[in-house]
Amino acid sequence: MDFPERVAGAISACDIALIKRPLELSTDGHRTTGSPNLLTRPKILPVSSFPPIRRALISVSDKSGLVDFAKGLVSLGVEIYSTGGTRKHLLDNGVTAHEVASYTGFPEVMDGRVKTLHPKIFGGILARRNREDDLASLRSHGILEFDLVVVNLYPFETTVQKPDTVLTEAIEQIDIGGPSLLRAAAKNHEFVSVASQPNQYATILAEMKTHGGTSDSLRLQLAFDCFGETARYDATIADYLCRTILSNETFNPRGDEPSHSGLASIAMPQSITIPMKLQSGLRYGENPHQSAALYRLPGNSKATLTDAKQLNGKELSYNNLLDLDNALSIVRCFAKPSAVVMKHNNPCGGASAHKLSFACRKALAGDPQSAFGGVLGFNAMVDLETAEELCQPGLFIEAIVAPDFSPEAISLLQTKPKWRENVRLMKTGPLGTQPIELCYRFISGGVLVQQSDNQPPTSLNWKTVTDVAVAEELWDDIAFGWEMVRHVKSNAIILARDAALVGVGAGQMSRVDSVELAIEKAADRSHGSILASDAFFPFADSIERASKAGIIAIIQPGGSRKDDEVIAACNAHRIPMIFTGQRHFKH
């Protein structure tokens, strides 16, 4: 006997031994040890590749398209069971629907918190139609099969987007039964169809009309969509609770004493799930060979780009969105009418004034050459005067974001400039302040997470460290410059005069090079300007250069080992300097 025959013989003998081996039972009759008895395996029944849908369970919050869908199901002989408001909606529109509570024998309780959480519901969803033992269990307990589950969830995301929503209101919009029903149906997608979104109704009906049931591929796709929906729903809840914790200044999960060192004291979450939903595809990413899309995050109650209404122009690009977002972050920091000009995600111009049109003019004058092809942001409604500033000859603008645009401004921007058909006009509504959020940066094998650097600036900890004091008339420019510099890529230096940027040095590897660049951009406007630096000066060379350029005040975090040398240089050149104690790196 050769090797294959010996192996076959051994396998055959093993099979016979397993079949003949009696079950080892405990005193109560349950099997305790031994191999499974092949003769006790459940009987597997044949099933159709298009399982028929005879009975549907429907319980939805979003009732759009539901009546037509339900009528289509009834016309195909489907029996409908439903709950509360959904059943009333169906009955009011002439669709017969059995009451779930009458079927289960258990009423809806606790203000509707418990409706469908019952074995007679979940058994009918989870039963495997090809298992004789599962079907026997249904029969013995009087459980009906549900072949289609139609559920969408309480509007938690919509609720928490309202600015006046409190935690107790949000909690009541956390759906419990809905996700459970969806997950049960999706798990048993081999036999059960699940509709978690109204846009799936037409596809389900079309297959039912053609085949009498749904295909394996459709049920798998519906299950995939369903698990994505429930995962995003739970992640949205976790995200909201995380935001709630971050916004509570007194919250200290570690229970230790509050930090007064300027260092972060809030513990980061142990795990994070980022809920995102596709909002739109983009033509490409930063470069034409990169695919890209815009995804929406939940829970935004303030003005955002994902909520903004586009009033004019071509579709937004990946780079447009980056510039618009930073522009929005900058202008919402100022109380006075303000404007900013963005280029490659850095401000090349920015200003505040008593009128928006003046702020716009000053912002464009910050770096007129770089402003060409830029993106503009405003914190007040763009009126006709401001629009006229934007229509100056030789200026080309990619996109503009603002809380609103007057009809006259829209009309002018759509008709006068050469770029009228292309400029994207984005209306956000009232801006408000930007909440502290978590920011994410993907690295190889992981994600860096930090709080956003948008805490309102405070001068309480500012300290004049030089012998010469700051002139009273300079404080507005100093505050303006300190707010602007944190939005510039490090190493960041800005020069400001009369509440306007006159020079920006961004992204240089050496701080003195950023100083040189800002002075070069400002030219003769550097005389009488203030200088703001996002981090300390490691050497006194930047002070020497600032003095030659006519800079009359400096604000910076401090903290260098050579602070004494830097302070001495400022004293020597009679330049007042403020230490803020807070760094604003941006990488």
Task: For the regions a language model picked out, list residue spans one by one.
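Short, low-complexity, charge-dense intrinsically disordered segments
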Residues: 9-14, 18-20, 26-36
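N-terminal glycine-/serine-/threonine-rich phosphate-binding loop
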Residues: 38-103
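Glycine-rich nucleotide/cofactor/substrate-binding loop typically near the N-terminus or early
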Residues: 85-156, 252-254, 258
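Active-site/ligand-binding-proximal alpha/beta "capping" segment
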Residues: 129-176, 183-185, 469-472
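Active-site loops and adjacent core secondary-structure elements that bind or stabilize anionic groups
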Residues: 199-453, 474-484, 488-492
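Glycine- and Gly-Pro-enriched alpha-helical subdomains that act as flexible
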Residues: 348-368, 500-543
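Cysteine/selenocysteine-centered motifs that mediate thiol-based redox chemistry or coordinate metal-sulfur cofactors
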Residues: 376-377, 383-387, 391-392, 524-563
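C-terminal binding/interaction regions
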Residues: 396-407, 545-585
